[in-house]
């Protein structure tokens, strides 16, 4: 019995030391985070405002973290490809997802099924920006304002076309919502990304597109005509362009929120470090200036704030999709 007691005592001591060493190792690993570059997956092709915004925050988060934050564009399938990549990545903080109201709003609302859960498979880090889309058309469209465009579209069903970044994209959803709200029939033409879609509008092959602050030089040069913004207030980048509400399309306000998330299960200490870096980046004057130029309004805040924004977007866009009879694909 005595020998057995000594054996158990030694076993307990060895086990206790092992646990201490394990806890110490995990603690040290988290304290040293990050010790290598971080990948920020953007589920869009290069060139769109989401890509531009992601590169801005990545640059300034790199400075705050002392490690490069590298943008990895994984566009396609209405953001599903990039989202699934991150959802199935190791939960160690080294693979992040740039999220917005499409990844966690319009896309789930327009999808029959998904290979991942947009809420349970991701851990919110921080809200970043919000902006409003702007309805743009090729100058060949003769209408001078939204009401004239609506009248023309009703008299000429399917003659006007709307370029989208793909089925289930924000362009697709907002365009479908506009058709439903106004009773028009503007035909959607899907592309693989916002860049190719915009090029065909500029070339006159497609009538219209929903754009953002990146389009300001094109509007100023007369290459695109700006009709209305889809936000709650006028866009500071386009102060002379009315909102949809001001233009007589009542209840049409769909601001697009941006944030960063990680795979579910990422350690709390790692999430806290990333949240602090994101909020530090948002305070930088250079970032704030660039955001203003693009029409990006700065959010900032806690993981809980982003979770709230995501849940509100999911509920809002699901309700709109149902009421507007927007089909699931």
Go through each PLM region and give its residues.
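N-terminal signal peptide c-region/cleavage motif recognized by signal peptidases
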Residues: 24-26
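Short coil/turn segments
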Residues: 45-47, 101-102, 130, 138-143, ...
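Hinge/capping helix and adjacent helix->loop/strand transition within the periplasmic-binding protein
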Residues: 61, 88-94, 109-196, 208, ...
